[in-house]
Amino acid sequence: MAAELAMGAELPSSPLAIEYVNDFDLMKFEVKKEPPEAERFCHRLPPGSLSSTPLSTPCSSVPSSPSFCAPSPGTGGGGGAGGGGGSSQAGGAPGPPSGGPGAVGGTSGKPALEDLYWMSGYQHHLNPEALNLTPEDAVEALIGSGHHGAHHGAHHPAAAAAYEAFRGPGFAGGGGADDMGAGHHHGAHHAAHHHHAAHHHHHHHHHHGGAGHGGGAGHHVRLEERFSDDQLVSMSVRELNRQLRGFSKEEVIRLKQKRRTLKNRGYAQSCRFKRVQQRHILESEKCQLQSQVEQLKLEVGRLAKERDLYKEKYEKLAGRGGPGSAGGAGFPREPSPPQAGPGGAKGTADFFL
């Protein structure tokens, strides 16, 4: 993994190389199909060996990467060092590209561009029928190996296994040389798919973050659903604190805030109901008082009429009694009988006088 990180750090920084890496697409290369005879011959070859005859097959030989630098002493005359005990092929046949440390040292100047050229040639010599893989499967295996190998290491062995299956048995060399070649190839592939891997990595972490947030939200929902609204309102503070032991502070604060909101809402509804009830009571009392006022007005009118009648009768009686009393005073009274004797005559004369 340290070799992979080292190769990823040695990527070219020139604008031309970066533009070439970004424009590189593996899907534009087609896979060459070999006849069944070549496939059977390929299966008869021992793993890890190289063919020294002109009848080389895709499983036994791969094209060498074009070199931008002078070959190092560790490289063969055919253009690449042999891997795992192999030698350079006769007649200028190219050797495997990742034979050993010498090959890596010989191409240390432009490792990314050389590996990209080698990958373009390697796609033409791969036999998909022997591996039962399609170009899409190969690209997916490379993408999965580049992303998970750089960020997760040994936690994803499936991607590494898919990458090994994509390489094929004829490409396998020595232990140390094969590891170095894999690191070199992975560095070039990481440069070719840097943008896609970064985008996939961003979505991967976003997915994990969303999953964690969803889990926390589910825990909060379970805590809030543990108590109904009626229980939260009717429960005492001491009982609620006893029930909330063992939960986080944020969850407790959220639940208490919900309880406070419910209590305030209930108090507001109670006040609103009381106001409405009092308004209805006052309106009914107002209607009763207004009806009583109308009845009192009618009673006042009736009493006023009765008063006027009694007053008129009194005036009539008073007017009739005044003239009768004045005429009665002028009526002659009856004379008293005359008295005998001289005193009687004198009294009568005094009476008339």
Swiss-Prot record:
GO biological process: insulin secretion; positive regulation of transcription by RNA polymerase II; regulation of DNA-templated transcription; regulation of transcription by RNA polymerase II; response to glucose
Any GO CC annotation of this UniProt entry: nucleus
Region (Disordered): 40-108, 177-219, 315-353
GO molecular function, one term: DNA-binding transcription factor activity
Biased composition (Low complexity): 46-73
Keywords of the record: Activator, Diabetes mellitus, Disease variant, DNA-binding, Isopeptide bond, Nucleus, Phosphoprotein, Transcription, Transcription regulation, Ubl conjugation
Domain bZIP: 254-317
Region (Leucine-zipper): 282-303
Modified how: Ubiquitinated, leading to its degradation by the proteasome.
Subcellular location per the Swiss-Prot or TrEMBL entry: Nucleus
PROSITE patterns assigned: BZIP
UniProt region (Basic motif), positions on chain: 254-279
Principal place of residence: nucleus
Biased composition (Basic residues): 183-210
Entry annotated with the keyword Protease: no
SUPFAM superfamilies linked to this entry: A DNA-binding domain in eukaryotic transcription factors, Leucine zipper domain
Expression tissues: Expressed in the islets of Langerhans (at protein level).
Location of cross-link Glycyl lysine isopeptide (Lys-Gly) (interchain with G-Cter in SUMO2): K32
Modified residues (Phosphothreonine): T53, T57
Similarity section: Belongs to the bZIP family. Maf subfamily.
PANTHER family named in the record: TRANSCRIPTION FACTOR MAF, TRANSCRIPTION FACTOR MAFA
Disease tied to this protein: Insulinomatosis and diabetes mellitus: An autosomal dominant disorder characterized by the occurrence of multicentric insulinomas, hyperinsulinemic hypoglycemia, non insulin-dependent diabetes mellitus, and impaired glucose tolerance. Some patients also exhibit congenital cataract and/or congenital glaucoma.
The protein's name in its UniProt record: Transcription factor MafA
